[in-house]
């Protein structure tokens, strides 16, 4: 297990329990700092003996940025000073055994790092620690520090670490949190090779089943190589050290032209041709790094050794998000996959997931599971992590989660609950305990072994971790905290309240007229409660907040969701339904909650398959509805979802039976090229 990340002789609670292992493995000398920072006149930033240009550049960086945060310019000096100051010595040492080191001797603090990324992070750790003791330095905008300023040394757990979330993509804070800047790290990313090929993409289409197919690319094509080569030379250059992903399109088929087949391609295995291109590019550009993705047509491991500047990104899409216990079959299968890749490369990056991509707004308690997975990845040879989140779209608790995840990427042994508490204590002075208690309860709810779904609706979330009673209590209490909070805390709480109004609406819709629902039942009719309209009004405030335009990966707009609520659920004040409360049955059997939804008198929303629809995945179903005692005349309405982009379609035919005899057959016709939303049939 990777446990020796960093250590100190005077450990804060974040490092408790690590000291024995850390001391044994690193051998750093321990010395505590006895004076507080405010006891001296200021800070002298300098360099050691035989300085390099990098030493000087980083010393000037710290001088300039510490000076900006000081309430007196003269309390921060560079090079020499006659004042009684703390002396901070900056050194870059590529031969350093650890990634970073802090050495304390009297009033001298020496910061040494092996590379620029760790030096930047280390300097902001210093600034934050100084600001906590010295009121003359402002570090209020910085996240909590995760190390103590005593003699300390350590190494980042992973060579590459990035988080694709609003906070993780903020260029002002990626380096502060020790993250790689995602936008600057990759010359080509993911399945974006077509953007590089541009207008010439038609020249490199794949051959599938003997025909040219524009859904996939040919990786043995000389034109493909030349286009990528020109792109790198013209846009990136040959002297830098960028990373590039060379991957097929997101389809399961591979090119089987004569050239690709000669390299070893088969119908669903593109690894041979992709590997040859990877080897060729890595030789052509030895200072850059080239990766492909272990996913779909490139999931099969190559039999060729990859050079030091080539590697693999392994998708964890088939490794469910649940507590790791060493017993799960999918866990063992993923371990075997990593072990196979370890035989051909040391550069193994993991593409993992930290959001529910069908719902960015409902809290997603990923932190403790992510910690376990990071330990697992490290033990099994991973050298880099890409956490795929909500991108630039708002996600509830994102700033806190990004802080905790960035700390765990540096050291997976840090205690999650302490990190969460430190963040809330700093950012939410009024509501810190209330937020902490609720969020940690969510985290603990999934430690029983339940799976976190990354494409889940509200019903699945409730089954996994989202207790309706606790959530509703939390949501209802939020208004008082928003009213009582001040400044930035009030704005952030208001933002969270607005986002969670989506969750409250979804929970209300899912529960219909039960105690957690949006409506009340009176006999054979239901009526929306006044509170439901308040939730919708609160959600309409999303325009006030950056990034809160969409609620999922498919870029479904919050405004459209609101419009559908108003059009389909709240349009009529009272809804009468003679089938209300009658429980259907099905052959073959299907989800009982789904069947109950058929007669709950709550309209499904056509824009989202999670919103009120019953999924029937088999070719043929028989739905039985007991109607004994109903002697009134009227129309029966059946609504079907038609959402081709998500592969949801209405049936081709409906047979209506009464007392065992078919008395009506309805044939349905839909245009798959048109997004119809729903198809209503009156019987």
Each model region followed by its residue ranges:
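Short, surface-exposed beta-strand/strand-loop-strand elements in extracellular ectodomains
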Residues: 646-661
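C-terminal non-catalytic alpha-helical accessory regions
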Residues: 139-143, 416-569
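Substrate-binding cleft/loops of secretory-pathway carbohydrate-active enzymes
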Residues: 295-318, 361-368, 394-401
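Extracellular carbohydrate recognition and processing domains
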Residues: 662-682
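Short, well-ordered secondary-structure micro-motifs within conserved domains or adaptor modules
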Residues: 66, 74-98
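Structured mid-domain segments that build the active-site/substrate or prosthetic-cofactor binding neighborhood
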Residues: 223-224, 332-433, 437
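Disordered, acidic Ser/Thr/Pro-rich linker "stalks" and the adjacent N-terminal cap
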Residues: 564-633, 639-650, 669-676
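Feature activates predominantly on carbohydrate-active enzymes
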Residues: 36-46, 58-61, 65, 70, ...
């Amino acid at each position: 297990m990777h446990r020796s990340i960093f250590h100190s002789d005077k450990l804060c609670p974040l490092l408790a329990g690590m000291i024995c292992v850390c001391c044994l493995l690193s051998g750093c000398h321990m010395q505590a700092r006895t004076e507080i920072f405010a006891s001296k006149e200021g800070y002298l930033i300098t360099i050691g003996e035989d300085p390099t240009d990098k030493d000087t550049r980083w010393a000037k960086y710290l001088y300039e940025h510490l000076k900006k945060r000081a309430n007196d310019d003269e309390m921060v000096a560079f090079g020499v000073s006659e004042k009684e100051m703390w002396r901070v010595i900056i050194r870059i040492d590529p031969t350093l055994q650890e990634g970073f080191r802090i050495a304390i001797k009297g009033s001298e603090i020496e910061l040494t790092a092996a590379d620029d990324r760790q030096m930047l992070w280390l300097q902001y750790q210093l600034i934050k620690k100084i600001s906590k003791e010295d009121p003359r330095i402002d570090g209020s905008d910085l996240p909590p520090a995760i190390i103590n300023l005593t003699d300390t040394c350590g190494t980042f757990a992973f060579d590459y670490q990035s988080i694709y979330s609003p906070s993780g993509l903020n260029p002002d804070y990626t380096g502060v949190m020790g993250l790689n800047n995602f936008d600057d790290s990759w010359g080509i990313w993911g399945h974006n090779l077509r953007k590089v090929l541009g207008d010439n993409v038609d020249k490199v289409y794949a051959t599938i089943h003997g025909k040219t197919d524009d859904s996939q690319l040919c990786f043995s094509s000389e034109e493909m190589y030349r286009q990528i080569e020109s792109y790198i030379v013209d846009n990136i250059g040959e002297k830098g050290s960028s990373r590039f992903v060379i991957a097929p399109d997101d389809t399961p088929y591979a090119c089987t032209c004569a050239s690709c087949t000669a390299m070893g391609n088969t119908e669903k295995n593109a690894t041979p041709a992709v590997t040859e291109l990877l080897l060729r590019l890595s030789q052509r550009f030895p200072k850059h790094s080239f990766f492909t993705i272990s996913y779909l047509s490139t999931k099969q491991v190559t039999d060729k050794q990859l050079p030091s500047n080539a590697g693999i990104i392994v998708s964890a899409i088939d490794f469910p998000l649940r507590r790791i216990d060493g017993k799960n079959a999918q866990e063992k299968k993923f371990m075997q996959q990593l072990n196979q890749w370890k035989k051909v490369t040391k550069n193994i990056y993991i593409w993992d997931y930290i959001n529910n991509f069908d719902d960015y707004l409902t809290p997603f308690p990923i932190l403790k599971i992510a910690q376990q997975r990071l330990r697992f990845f490290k033990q099994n040879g991973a050298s880099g992590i890409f956490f795929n989140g909500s991108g630039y779209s708002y996600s509830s608790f994102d700033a806190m989660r990004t802080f905790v995840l960035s700390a765990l990427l540096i050291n997976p042994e840090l205690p999650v609950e302490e990190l969460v508490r430190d963040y809330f204590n700093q950012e939410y002075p009024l509501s810190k305990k209330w937020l902490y208690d609720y969020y940690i309860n969510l985290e603990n709810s999934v430690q029983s072994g339940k799976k976190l779904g990354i494409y889940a609706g509200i019903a699945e979330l409730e089954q996994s971790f989202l207790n309706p009673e606790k959530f509703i209590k939390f949501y209802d209490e939020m208004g008082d905290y928003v009213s009582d909070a001040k400044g930035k805390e009030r704005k952030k709480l208001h933002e969270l309240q607005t986002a969670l109004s989506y969750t409250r609406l979804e929970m209300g819709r899912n529960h219909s007229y039960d105690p957690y629902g949006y409506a009340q039942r009176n006999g054979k009719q239901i009526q929306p409660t006044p509170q439901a309209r308040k939730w919708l009004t609160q959600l309409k405030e999303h325009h006030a907040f950056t990034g809160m335009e969409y609620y999922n990966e498919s870029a479904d707009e919050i405004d459209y969701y609101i419009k559908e609520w108003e059009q389909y659920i709240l349009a009529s004040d009272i809804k009468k339904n003679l089938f209300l409360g009658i429980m259907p049955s099905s052959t073959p059997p299907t989800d009982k909650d789904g069947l109950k939804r058929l007669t709950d008198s709550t309209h499904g929303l056509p824009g989202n398959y999670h919103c009120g629809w019953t999924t029937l995945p088999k070719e043929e179903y028989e739905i039985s509805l007991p109607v004994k005692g109903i002697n009134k005349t009227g129309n029966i309405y059946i609504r079907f979802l038609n959402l081709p982009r998500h592969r949801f379609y209405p049936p081709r035919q409906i047979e209506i039976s009464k007392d065992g005899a078919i008395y009506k057959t309805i044939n349905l016709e839909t245009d798959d090229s048109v997004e119809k939303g729903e198809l209503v049939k009156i019987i």
